[in-house]
Amino acid sequence: MPIQSAHDLLNRSLIYYQGRPVGTAAACDERVSAANYNECFIRDFVPSALVFLMTGRHDIVRNFLETVMHLSGHQHVMKGHRRSMGLMPASFHVVREDGEEKVVTDFGDRAIGRVTPVDSAMWWMILLRAYVVTTGDQAFAEREDVQGYIANILDLYLRERFESSPTPAFFPAAKSGDCRRSRP
């Protein structure tokens, strides 16, 4: 019975966009006061996605991968900075206004500490690999848009410096180099 109740809770947490399940909300309890708990967090969706993959609900994971990939270029760009094309949002949710559905993203603007979500894209790539291994849908991973996005992620993570927001203002040690590890 506990496993069935966990599956029921997972099903209640599904977020839909254009009639398709695209993720899960962080919490289903409306009494929870955190403003963003109705959102799907990229990193936190991965355990749910693994359950969906193990139970044959592959479409939810594929919908998530596609939706999040297309959200990557939506981040607000601060003056003096440029858009980091491989960056993914920390979270997203769907709003309905005037009969239209719209996906609203958070690239760290509403997060605790306002930290840029640099790990989201890695979780997306890990989940992409799990999806392909589980489903055998290699064609999805080989699509031109998916390959282009993987290239953007690798470009983001392999460049010498990462600039999307003024992180040193929040972490003074990073600005002075005090947080560097000793290298042999």
Predicted features by range, described:
Residues 1-184:
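Acidic, mature catalytic/reactive cores of soluble proteins
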